[in-house]
């Protein structure tokens, strides 16, 4: 392989070297002095306040589990007191091992600068190994202040894992498949959580009216669900302050009722805290005990949402809220319910509501319904965030995303997804009509997401944390010791409702994987079809055409090279704009890109060609908002670049460095090859960087007061002329040139690929948002260039 690469290098010739000099990707000249990410420090009072607020956002789903756990564990009733004790013991130690130890004290630490969820874990891995979803990244992206990653010694475990992941494409593809499975199943949670929470809370109506039909409860639940999803476009900004008090009141209620029932009925239920009763439970009930695990597992539903909703609060605040309020109240609630069920074995179906004293029954019903709505809202919001992350990383069709709050960036609303969730949620609620089958479906979804998180934590601990292998093995053993039995129990209930999340996850997986596959293949086609810069510059300053006044923004996913649509454009039209800017908008595996680091601008070729490249970088949390004028931002970037470029040319330490304004076609190659050794000449001051022909300046960066830059009169005159020329071109008109491509499978492709590309991907592209809408391009300034890509 070495000899082959060497022979290729010798055969490339001077034209290849010229192309590399003229149009290098945004390379090391774009490096900047970074402000390292530092975790914010909070005062004790602020931490307590944030811990209180986290109750309404993070813990609603986990807190409403006592509404339906015991019924799903014993759908056919309870025969023996020991069964209840054994089930309670399982609940206690499941809550201890999974939410408390695994998530609160381990997984929450694996956040991406405060962002949680499956894609946050994946973005961490993408930064520490070259496994990004779309291969248009470059090493300059690593210079972002939010692009933190570790370095490894050559023979360390982390370095070996990194090389193993990067070695073959199929390994990276398998990792992506695992991430998509977890993501799609988490989306299923956004359907099942509102269904089971609202249906369980509404069931309290029937407890006081035994003769009431089950259909009435279902109708009430559907009405609540319709109201909940219909209000999503208003956002939670105005009513969000109510969530924390409601959930706190809920935890106080279930904790107090639990303590009352322990005192009133069987205090001996406390022996369930002895794990020996878990062994006795399985020994006595055999296969029945294993089947009941599917219901017991519902006691930890909402745990994954605890991680997914992490972005709103610091880790320590969530740890305080869970250990001081959530965990003790849940233990009291389940223990009190167990005591009540032992005394009233025939009330297991409605154990929660029947255990409430009559004097506070209806206030408790109102609080339970409100808590169920809050829990559903938190899961729906988490689903929006998951889809936004998937969309940013090229794994979901471009759907409309709406900001619902001017204060909080994370509060979004996705109309198309909202109505899909509503339809599926109503179908599940009205179709099953009871908690048992929905619970079976819910349990299957939850345990799959947890298994995916466990799997992803292994490379996180080795690559990111550099943990000792003994700690990694301990984490895996303790996690799988709980999750594998629960997963096997859920598989036993596939035919009793467990198939629902599998069908939902499969449908979303097909959509996401087909979209990602075709997006990557389309990018690879563009890479292979890109035009050499040497060829473009060989056409001369006029590009062999008439240069008409105006600015042309040519949008492309390529961070280097000239897209094929541009050569197609100049081949079929006799004119091109006086100023051409290749615009690349790309998302990186970071949660956000600061505004002062978002744009990178460089000049391509000699000045009289007036060709530039602008790369706009976004994180998966960033959004293109409607009030952003993308065209204005791009133009300001160009102006800033020209001013800073002129400053660097006039710098006193660069006297023997010059940028020729004009070169003849024949002199371009020799001049650049002669200057190759000086091509990395760079003058930097703080966070401003510049080099000769490959000029890269991060715009919107603050200039330091002690700067030593000075103008020469000639440079000042030149930049004034160019700025004036650029403004005249803007006044003449700006045109946005986008590729209107049709993607088709090659004729020799298999039938599955043809169906995926020619029909599924084509349909999704037809119904999703166009780039012109995403970038807010005025219709009168839009020019589409049609092409067919065969992938």
Swiss-Prot record:
GO terms for cellular component: membrane. It comes from the Eukaryota. GO terms for molecular function: potassium ion transmembrane transporter activity. Residues 71-87, 197-215, 260-289, 339-359, 433-444, 490-496 are extracellular. InterPro entries: K+_transporter (IPR003855), K_trans_C (IPR053952), K_trans_N (IPR053951). High-affinity potassium transporter. This is Probable potassium transporter 11. The lineage of its organism: Eukaryota, Viridiplantae, Streptophyta, Embryophyta, Tracheophyta.
């Amino acid at each position: 392989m070495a000899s082959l690469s060497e022979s290729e290098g010798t055969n490339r010739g001077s034209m290849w070297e010229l192309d590399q000099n003229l149009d290098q990707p945004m390379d090391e000249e774009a490096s900047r002095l970074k402000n390292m990410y530092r975790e914010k420090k909070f005062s004790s009072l602020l931490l307590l306040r944030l811990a209180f607020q986290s109750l309404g956002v993070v813990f609603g789903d986990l807190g409403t589990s006592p509404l339906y756990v015991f019924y799903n564990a014993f759908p056919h009733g309870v025969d023996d007191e020991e069964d209840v004790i054994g089930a309670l013991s399982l609940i206690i130690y499941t809550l201890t091992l999974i939410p408390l130890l695994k998530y609160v004290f381990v997984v929450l630490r694996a956040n991406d600068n405060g962002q949680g969820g499956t894609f946050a874990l994946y973005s961490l891995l993408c930064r520490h190994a070259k496994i990004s979803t779309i291969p248009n990244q470059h090493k300059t992206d690593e210079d972002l202040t939010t692009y933190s990653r570790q370095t490894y010694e050559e023979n360390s475990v982390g370095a070996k894992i990194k090389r193993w992941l990067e070695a073959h494409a199929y390994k990276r593809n398998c990792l992506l498949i695992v991430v998509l499975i977890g993501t799609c199943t988490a989306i299923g949670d956004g359907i099942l959580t509102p269904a089971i929470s609202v249906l369980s809370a509404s069931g309290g109506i029937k407890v006081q009216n035994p003769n009431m039909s089950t259909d009435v409860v279902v109708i009430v639940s559907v009405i609540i669900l319709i109201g909940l999803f219909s209000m999503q476009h208003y956002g939670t900004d105005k009513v969000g302050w109510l969530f924390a008090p409601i959930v706190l009141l809920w935890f106080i209620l279930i904790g107090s009722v639990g303590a009352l029932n322990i005192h009133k009925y069987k205090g001996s239920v406390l022996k369930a805290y002895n794990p020996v009763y878990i062994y006795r439970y399985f020994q006595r009930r055999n296969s029945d005990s294993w089947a009941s695990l599917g219901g017991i597992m519902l006691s930890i539903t909402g745990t994954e949402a605890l991680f997914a909703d992490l972005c709103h609060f610091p880790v320590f605040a969530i740890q305080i809220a869970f250990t001081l309020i959530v965990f003790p109240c849940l233990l009291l609630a389940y223990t009190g319910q167990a005591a009540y069920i032992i005394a009233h074995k025939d009330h297991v179906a409605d154990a929660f509501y029947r255990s409430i004293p009559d004097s506070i029954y209806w206030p408790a019903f109102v609080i339970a319904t409100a808590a169920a709505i809050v829990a559903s809202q938190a899961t729906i919001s988490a689903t929006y965030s998951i889809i936004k992350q998937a969309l940013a990383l090229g794994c979901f069709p471009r759907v409309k995303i709406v900001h619902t709050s001017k204060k909080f960036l994370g509060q979004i609303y996705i109309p198309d997804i909202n109505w899909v969730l509503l339809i599926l949620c109503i179908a599940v609620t009205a179709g099953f009509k009871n908690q048992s089958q929905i619970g079976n479906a819910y349990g299957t979804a939850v345990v799959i997401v947890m298994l995916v998180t466990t799997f992803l934590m292994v490379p996180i601990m080795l690559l990111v944390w550099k943990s000792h292998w003994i700690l990694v093995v301990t984490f895996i053993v303790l996690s799988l010791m709980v999750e594998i039995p629960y997963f096997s129990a859920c598989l036993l209930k596939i035919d009793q409702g467990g198939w629902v999340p599998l069908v939902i996850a499969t449908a979303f997986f097909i959509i996401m994987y087909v979209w990602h596959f075709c997006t990557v293949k389309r990018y690879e086609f563009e890479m292979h079809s890109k035009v050499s810069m040497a060829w473009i510059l060989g056409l001369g300053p006029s590009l062999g055409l008439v240069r008409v006044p105006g600015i042309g923004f040519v949008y492309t996913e390529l961070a280097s090279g000239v897209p094929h649509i541009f050569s197609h454009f100049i081949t079929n039209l006799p004119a091109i704009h006086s100023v051409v800017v290749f615009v690349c908008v790309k998302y990186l595996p970071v949660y956000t890109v600061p505004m002062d680091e978002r744009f990178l601008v460089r000049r391509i070729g000699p000045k009289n060609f007036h060709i530039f490249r602008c790369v706009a970088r976004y994180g998966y949390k960033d959004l293109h908002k409607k009030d952003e004028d993308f065209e204005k931002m791009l133009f300001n970037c160009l102006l800033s670049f020209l001013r800073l470029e002129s400053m660097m040319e006039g710098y006193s330490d660069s006297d023997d460095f010059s940028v020729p304004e004009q070169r003849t076609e024949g002199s371009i190659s020799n001049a650049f090859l002669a200057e190759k050794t000086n091509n990395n000449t760079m003058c930097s001051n703080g966070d401003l960087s510049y080099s000769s022909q490959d000029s890269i300046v991060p715009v919107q960066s603050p200039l330091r007061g002690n700067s030593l830059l000075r103008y020469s009169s000639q440079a000042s005159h030149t930049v004034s002329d160019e700025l004036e020329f650029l403004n005249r071109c803007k006044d003449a008109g700006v045109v946005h040139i986008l590729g209107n491509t049709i993607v088709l499978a090659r004729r020799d492709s298999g039938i599955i690929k043809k169906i995926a590309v020619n029909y599924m991907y084509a349909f999704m592209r037809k119904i999703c948002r166009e780039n012109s809408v995403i970038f807010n391009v005025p219709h009168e300034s839009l020019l589409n260039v049609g092409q067919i890509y065969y992938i």
